[in-house]
Amino acid sequence: GTEFIGTLEDDVIIKTIFDLEQFIGQEIHWVTGKTFDDVIKRGKRANGDTAIYLPNPTMRFCTTEMKLKPIFKWWQKTINKPVEMRIGFRANEMRRAKTMNDKLNSNNLLEYKSIVGKSKNGKRNKWKNIEWQKPAFPLITDVIYKDNIINYWNNKPVKFAVHNNCVGCFHREIHMLKHMSEKHTSKFDWFVKQEEQSRKTYNDRSWNLKMDYSKIKSWNRQGQIFTDDDFTECDSGYCGL
């Protein structure tokens, strides 16, 4: 197994998984890959500093390394044949479903490019596109919106986080990131630290193309103080429109 230390998401999400296991009466399999710290490391510079290469809106490899790859590896080990995977996109997120469906191959399956061996001299990896999942979207099929989901879970013993994904997700708007820096200070500080290191060690690379996270953290907003209820999924970078 792997020692669990924590995540860069709202800690409520971890409790949600425990609550769901009790509610449905079934085990939920936890999968894990590299830590975020390891995913962004790119060796050492001449001065001994660790080079940090950050994902950003133009290259979001964090999703592949920390979500898709661990799921694929678990599937490969335990199932290893194409299966239907039910994706939780809601009725207003048809655009996201279309993006996924546009990637289907001629067999209407998604493929994952994975290492399947080594070259004859053992110096290079051999890669193959492996068919592994057929996505299904039951919430879209049944025309389920967020209010339907909230009503369903109302008064049930499962608590959900207000916002999903990493607190410093680069898809989020500036106001939302500022709110996260105040609500989850220690987690957001990790993003600030990594960006400062990346600026020094990897071609001035940053998380967000609009504003450095250190500036977002120190930004003194004038006027309204935001609460969780003031933000939508569009602010989180996942608008279904």
Locate the predicted segments by residue:
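Nucleotide-activated chemistry modules centered on ATP-dependent adenylation/adenylyltransferase
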Residues: 1-241
